[in-house]
């Protein structure tokens, strides 16, 4: 008889829940709930289990915030809870709450060829470290290493490292944003809001007033070629994505590959393919040759967070992935 566990992927707006076959890792019966409609994550879980008339004893839920102990307070939502209390209230034997990019990193060993698009480099080297990053509401970062037949995710807050410009244009962007924000992290330019920051800085550096645009509007105008400033912003976004990915590759020697997740890049895939992304990735001066063969992949799986939550739980329960 198939045994299922609950898996989840929770962001600032939505909570996506599903069932994971503990034997195969297959994800099924995924459903998305608006976080605004429920007082707590526990309430959403109860509704999901009731709707699907299923009883589970284990669960793993990925959340877009740092997980440092039993108390979880979401940074972009009002939900806050004790993991131990939620586990007890739901009657679970095992409940894991993990960082969203821990889940995305754990999905990587589960992905098939059709879930990936490669951008340069050669084949990944088995057993070598892996990096994953992705722009969305923020900039998530994690690494993945294989140790003693187990995958170990190394999450952190890498999106908040300093933005490091490497061209005259990028230097001007930094000056504009520093005057407005003080500290300028990579997330300030590599995210949905970051794309708007790039657009605004480009316009302001030319002594003009920027329009009050949303990220989607910047992208749409860039792709329609109806706004030169938006197109410059999107082009710069792609190059800086490359630089940042190259930095991750250098930091941990990620010859196992660098993976891009998140919802932004797939919206302008053809533009991204023709952009300066790979050039930015390899623009490492004396260490260009070091990163040239490292492959970069865009993850195009629909639910890597759910897939990775299931993989994390299965490994925690003793399976070899």
Swiss-Prot record:
The keyword Nucleotide-binding applies. It catalyses: D-glucose + ATP = D-glucose 6-phosphate + ADP + H(+). The keyword Kinase applies. Its EC number is 2.7.1.2. It is an enzyme of class 2 (transferase). It is found in: Cytoplasm. ATP binds at residues 8-13. One of its GO terms (cellular component) is cytosol. One of its GO terms (biological process) is glycolytic process. GO terms for molecular function: ATP binding; D-glucose binding; glucokinase activity. InterPro entries: ATPase_NBD (IPR043129), Bacterial_glucokinase (IPR050201), Glucokinase (IPR003836). Keywords: ATP-binding, Cytoplasm, Glycolysis, Kinase, Nucleotide-binding, Transferase. Belongs to the bacterial glucokinase family. NCBIfam families: glk, PRK00292.1-1, PRK00292.1-3. This is Glucokinase. The lineage of its organism: Bacteria, Pseudomonadati, Pseudomonadota, Gammaproteobacteria, Enterobacterales. The gene is glk.
């Amino acid at each position: 008889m198939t045994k299922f566990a609950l898996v989840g992927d929770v962001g600032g707006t939505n909570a996506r829940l599903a069932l994971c076959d503990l034997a195969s890792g297959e994800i099924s019966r995924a459903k998305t709930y608006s976080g605004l409609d429920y007082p707590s994550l526990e309430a959403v879980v109860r509704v999901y289990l009731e709707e699907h008339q299923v009883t589970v004893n284990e669960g793993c839920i990925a959340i877009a915030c740092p997980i440092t102990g039993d108390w979880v307070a979401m940074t972009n939502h009002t939900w806050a809870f004790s993991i131990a209390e939620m586990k007890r209230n739901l009657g679970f034997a095992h409940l894991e709450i993990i960082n969203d990019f821990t889940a995305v990193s754990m999905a990587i060993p589960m992905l098939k060829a059709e879930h990936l698009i490669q951008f340069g480099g050669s084949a990944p080297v088995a057993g070598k470290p892996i990096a994953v990053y992705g722009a969305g509401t923020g900039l998530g970062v994690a690494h993945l290493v294989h140790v003693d037949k187990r995958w170990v995710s190394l999450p952190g807050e890498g999106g908040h490292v300093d933005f490091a410009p490497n061209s005259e244009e990028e230097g001007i962007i930094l000056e504009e944003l520093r005057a407005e924000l003080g500290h300028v992290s990579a997330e300030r330019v590599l995210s949905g809001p970051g794309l708007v920051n790039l657009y605004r800085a480009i316009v302001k550096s030319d002594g003009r007033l920027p329009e009050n645009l949303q990220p989607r509007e910047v992208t749409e105008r860039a792709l329609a070629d109806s706004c030169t400033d938006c197109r410059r912003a999107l082009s710069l976004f792609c190059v800086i994505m490359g630089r940042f990915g190259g930095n991750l590759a250098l930091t941990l020697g990620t010859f196992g590959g660098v993976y891009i997740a998140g919802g932004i890049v797939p919206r302008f895939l053809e533009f991204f393919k023709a952009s300066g992304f790979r050039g930015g990735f390899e623009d490492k001066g004396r260490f260009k040759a070091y990163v040239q063969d490292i492959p970069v992949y865009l993850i195009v799986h629909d639910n890597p967070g759910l897939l990775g939550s299931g993989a994390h739980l299965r490994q925690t329960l003793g399976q070899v992935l």
